[in-house]
Amino acid sequence: MAPRKSASVSSRKTAAKPAKKDFAGGTIAEFSKEDDLKAYREMLLIRRFEEKAGQLYGMGFIGGFCHLYIGQEAVVVGMQLALKEGDQVITGYRDHGHMLACGMSARGVMAELTGRRGGLSKGKGGSMHMFSKEKHFYGGHGIVGAQVSLGTGLAFANRYRGNDNVSLAYFGDGAANQGQVYESFNMAALWKLPVIYIVENNRYAMGTSVSRASAQTDFSQRGASFGIPGYQVDGMDVRAVKAAADEAVEHCRSGKGPIILEMLTYRYRGHSMSDPAKYRSKDEVQKMRSEHDPIEQVKARLTDKGWATEDELKQIDKEVRDIVADSADFAQSDPEPDVSELYTDILL
């Protein structure tokens, strides 16, 4: 069951696979055995990676801020399943999961967290500022909401070049109240730019609940005055995300302009590693874990349908843990950047 009732993206079926209605009323994609196994492995990699990052932070290997993506894995994994080569992704500071889903190496991401030479930004960007032109990932941004206008710019570049690539701009429910978000909506609607605005509504902007910070709590309707269609999606179900992603991508590629997807999701950890999250109860968190966990949903489907045994799933978990352990070892042993690198890669 979804965290709160989600709406169907449209009555039209997804282009890739037939869709059906789940009990919450939202559209879900039909997943094959291979689809579920792929989603399970990729979400599990993000989960185990973030758990290890939290451990390294506690041990003092990671400095500064560290925002974990635990609980929200279905959002980025489901969206990536609908993309093609050349589509771009940009997000805010809770970005480790997005990078892994885009295919960036666990070693490179973890080494960047510890500020090492082998990090994706050569140890100079840290948790919030990683980029990969090769993977079409444009950050990782520490300024709240700044990525929305940049993601709109990526879509403008696609339109200008005449390709059919789509830009995905992720931001949270807190960033949704930033003025530059609405400037971006206006420009994207005016020029019919191929951008999907993905609001990851995890219910809390740092420690402030949505109801205390937003007069309009249905973020999918934030673009209505610009004529931008928007839909709520069960962001805890990777199939629902995939179905919404398929239709949103088709909407953009066909020249219809921007679209907004509000992902109803939940983060299990605090806003950052320094946040004890006392603004919510343990029962609330446990209820979400026990009833809506995105990984457990896929695991249950795999076993219920006979697509995987418990031993096979344990083997996948072991393989993922080995990848994460290797990344952690590398991130602790790789040298820090030489002092001569201090002023390189700096835009003046």
UniProtKB/Swiss-Prot annotation:
Protein's job: The pyruvate dehydrogenase complex catalyzes the overall conversion of pyruvate to acetyl-CoA and CO(2). It contains multiple copies of three enzymatic components: pyruvate dehydrogenase (E1), dihydrolipoamide acetyltransferase (E2) and lipoamide dehydrogenase (E3).
Subunit composition and interactions: Heterodimer of an alpha and a beta chain.
One GO term describing the cellular component: intracellular membrane-bounded organelle
Superkingdom field: Bacteria
Entry annotated with the keyword Oxidoreductase: yes
Entry keyword set: Oxidoreductase, Pyruvate, Thiamine pyrophosphate
Disordered: region residues: 1-21
Protein name: Pyruvate dehydrogenase E1 component subunit alpha
Organism: Rhizobium meliloti (strain 1021) (Ensifer meliloti)
Cofactor requirement: thiamine diphosphate
Annotated GO biological process: pyruvate decarboxylation to acetyl-CoA
EC number: 1.2.4.1
InterPro entries: DH_E1, PDH_E1_Alpha_Subunit, Pyrv_DH_E1_asu_subgrp-y, THDP-binding
Gene: pdhA
Catalytic reaction annotation: N(6)-[(R)-lipoyl]-L-lysyl-[protein] + pyruvate + H(+) = N(6)-[(R)-S(8)-acetyldihydrolipoyl]-L-lysyl-[protein] + CO2
Enzyme class: oxidoreductase
Pfam families, per the entry: E1_dh
NCBIfam families named among the record's database cross-references: PDH_E1_alph_y
GO molecular function: pyruvate dehydrogenase (acetyl-transferring) activity
